[in-house]
Each structure stands twice: as structure tokens, then as C-alpha cells.
Amino acid sequence: MANPAVGAMMGLSLVAVPVFLDTNTQSEQLLAQFASLYDYGHKLMPTIAVATCALHGWVAARKRAAHQPWGRPVLAAVTTITMVPFTWVCMVSTNNALFQLHKGADANMEMVRALIARWQWLHVARSLFPLAGAIVACQTLLKELVGGSR
């Protein structure tokens, strides 16, 4: 099972955010675009991550019930959902700073650009968790297709 959110998540950091940084000359507009991007993303991406984690868990449960190795689907599930605690631990302070500036705190463009660039690379790092989960799941599937479920 590949995680459909991975491409979307990477696209945000590798395409959308650079466009925002390259085309905005006012911090207010840049903050508004970030807030909108975040709003759309936080409504969709966690649901996809949880659904993908649940699918990996379902595969693990089916394999366990069939007395087959089930550790790799669990690894895929845990790896995928690790993006959530990563967000809480590593990204919340950056998110909060950006939202505080968006609410009207005095924001100079350099500070806003630096915070959004920091968010961009933290988001790339966060995107690697579901990517790693998808890689584990694909490797497991390929191993089963080629050599059976040993």
C-alpha cells in the first residue's frame, strides 16, 4: 500500500512553498497563504495518514490471524503515523509562531520568510515518515509476490 498523501505532502514543501516565497513581497500576504495552505492540509492529510495506518493495521491483523508474519505491516503502520508525534514535538512552535504573526503581530518579511522556510524543511522531514511506511509496505508486498509469504 502506497500512501497517497506522500506526493501531496512533498508537493507542498517542494513546489507550493517555494512559489509563495518567490512571489510574495508582503509578509501579510505570505502569512495568509501559509494559513490557507495549513488549513487545507490539516483537514485532509491527517485523515489520509490515519486511514493508511489503519489499512496497514488491517493487513497485519489478517496476516496474524492466518499465522503469517505480520511485523512488517505493523512497522509500516507505526512508521506512517509517527508523523503525528513528530508534528507535536518538532513543528508546533513554528506553527504557533506563524499563526501568531498571522493574527496581527508585527511581522517583518525576513522573519516570516525564515519561519516559513523552517516549516518547509520540517514538513519535508515529516513527509518522510509516511514515505518510509509506504516503502516498507511495498517491499513487503513485492517480497510476497516474488517469494511467497515466508
From Swiss-Prot:
Its EC number is 1.10.3.-. Pathway: Secondary metabolite biosynthesis. One of its GO terms (molecular function) is monooxygenase activity. It is found in: Membrane. Its main location: membrane. The chain crosses the membrane at residues 1-21, 41-61, 73-93, 128-148. Keywords: Membrane, Monooxygenase, Oxidoreductase, Transmembrane, Transmembrane helix. It comes from the Eukaryota. Belongs to the anthrone oxygenase family. Anthrone oxygenase; part of the gene cluster that mediates the biosynthesis of geodin, an intermediate in the biosynthesis of other natural products. The pathway begins with the synthesis of atrochrysone thioester by the polyketide synthase (PKS) gedC. The atrochrysone carboxyl ACP thioesterase gedB then breaks the thioester bond and releases the atrochrysone carboxylic acid from gedC. The atrochrysone carboxylic acid is then converted to atrochrysone which is further transformed into emodin anthrone. This is Anthrone oxygenase gedH.
